[in-house]
């Protein structure tokens, strides 16, 4: 599966647009790690536990988006974008979405 944030893929022609595909997940951190993160905000710097949380969530969202595209018979997903939102305290949703397409090498 070819993934692109652009609308076109160099060296390929889009021969069919199959529709929008998306993948999302909601993740939360363990209470103990959340308390440690709260103290980290006082000192400043990267909160690694949250960085890891969002990286894991983004990867899951991407895999779910790819699974949707594969069900449609897509070769690629173009125009990929990401969104995130706080669902509740200490829980974040990550959304990956794009357009599933069939492509042909030029």
Swiss-Prot record:
Q: Which SUPFAM superfamilies match?
A: YbjQ-like
Matching entries from InterPro entries are given as:
UPF0145_dom_sf, UPF0145_YbjQ-like
Q: Which domain of life is it from?
A: Bacteria
Q: Which Pfam families match?
A: YbjQ_1 (PF01906)
Q: Where are the transmembrane segments?
A: none
Which family, according to the similarity comment? Belongs to the UPF0145 family.
HAMAP family on file:
UPF0145 (MF_00338)
The name this protein carries in UniProt is UPF0145 protein Tlet_1264
Q: What is the lineage of its organism?
A: Bacteria, Thermotogati, Thermotogota, Thermotogae, Thermotogales
